[in-house]
Amino acid sequence: MSLPLHPRIGVSTWSLHKSITAGTPLLDIPAQVAAHGMGKLEVCHFHFPRTDAAYLAEFRAALESAGVEFYTLLIDEGDLTSPDRAERDRVLAMITHWIEVAAQVGARRVRVIAGDAAPTEESLRLSKAGLLEVLRHADAHGVRVVTENWHPLLDHPAAIITLMERMEGRLGLKLDFGNWPGDRKYVDLPRIAPLAECTHAKATFPAPGEMDRTDFTRCLDICRDAGFQGPHILIFSDPGDEWDSLDQMREVVLPYAVGTTRRAG
């Protein structure tokens, strides 16, 4: 039985990577997402088998038929802080291509990597310059740009806060539960949660079917306590059945998405 679609719960194709690489067509994914009660989909750029206009129109039609929103196209490569100008130009051209793809298929956002360099003043300058160029193209296509607490430049809250301030509200932030290992996430995620407009809500499964619910709910609590109102995009990358695991995660996230949890104290 299909579940009602929830507009604040979605899934990334990274969570379905095993199925897709085993042969499930990307065109079939929107209907699967809808059947599991999730209203949003994110697609990794490398999961597109083609980017010609005919294929993109077919995928857009599949999304519309399923009633699923293409929330973010995830651009999973590119270093805007490379010291090599030619490499930065190549990265910008690549990102521009995927912005055009996003616009054609109806994606509301693209997620880009802010940089692979350590967060120095020069690397932050290069990142801002590159992101402003990305924004110039994205704005022309009506696509919002977000980045993530991911890769060396944005591996610590201070650098994220600095870059977001310098971008003056033009850049969004995706908060990923799984990018900062160990207990540091419980210290660092609260510092950036007030800036986040969407999450990658990753739960770990130490064994197939056995979710670390304590860690997952602790991360969800951090977002709730920061006043987070955006969508939670579910991320699964452990052994076990993908949809069974994602269904477990959806049940945990649902009270947070409908606002029925309360702060302790």
Residue ranges and their predicted role:
Residues E42, T72-L74, R111, V146, ...:
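Conserved beta-strand positions in the central sheet of alpha/beta enzyme cores
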Residues F48-P49, G78, A117, L153, ...:
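Positions that flank functional sites
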Residues E42-E64, A114-P119:
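Glycine-rich, proline-tolerant flexible connector loops at the mouths of alpha/beta enzymes
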Residues L3, A62-E69, I75, L80-G172, ...:
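Active-site acidic/histidine proton-transfer and metal-coordination neighborhood
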